[in-house]
């Protein structure tokens, strides 16, 4: 597969019907990665992570539900923990508003049906009234279920 790198972060998977066209994510930027060095599995996991970030910026809870497992829990920078539905409710009602998300220096690892995507999130957001740009490094876990990468809790 031939990949073309545009604007430092946009991958167009030529010959695959633009399957991984990161430029469709208008509120998500990738920095510090050469996607042409990723294999198909790594690229698909990174694409799913970027797709989730775009859904966050659009408050597209239906897409978020497609990507996130039902038993997922979220831990905020403050330490507050929420179930998937509690978190999605806050996104839907605007308590959490994401304007743009940068994915800096992502590292993708795939082992069978499990994948990790580790990166520094640069979130421009209004989180419960605290507006600004927030930087957080984290690892996101995905499990391949029926051919799709689904965000899951950290495996124990």
Residue ranges, per PLM feature:
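A mature extracytoplasmic/lumenal domain signature
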Residues: 68, 78-79, 102, 107, ...
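Short hydrophobic/aromatic-rich beta-strand segments that constitute the beta-sheet cores
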Residues: 74-75, 117, 151-153
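Short, low-complexity N-terminal intrinsically disordered segments enriched in polar/charged residues
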Residues: 13-70
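Short solvent-exposed beta->alpha transition segments
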Residues: 46, 65-102
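Hydrophobic pocket/interface hotspot
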Residues: 52, 64, 72, 87, ...
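Bacterial N-terminal signal peptides
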Residues: 1-8
């Amino acid at each position: 597969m031939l990949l073309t790198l545009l604007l430092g972060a946009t991958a167009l998977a030529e010959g695959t019907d633009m399957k991984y066209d990161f430029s469709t994510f208008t509120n998500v930027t990738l920095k510090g990665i050469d996607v042409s060095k990723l294999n198909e599995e790594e690229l698909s996991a990174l694409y799913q992570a970027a797709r989730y970030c775009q859904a966050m910026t659009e408050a597209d809870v239906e897409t978020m539900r497609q990507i996130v497992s039902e038993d997922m829990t979220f831990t905020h920078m403050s330490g507050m923990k929420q179930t998937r539905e509690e978190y999605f409710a806050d996104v839907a009602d605007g308590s959490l508003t994401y304007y743009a998300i940068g994915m800096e220096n992502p590292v993708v690892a795939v082992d069978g049906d499990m994948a990790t995507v580790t990166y520094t999130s640069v979130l421009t957001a209004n989180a419960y009234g605290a507006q600004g740009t927030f930087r957080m490094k984290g690892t996101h876990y995905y499990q391949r279920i029926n051919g799709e990468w689904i965000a899951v809790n950290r495996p124990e």
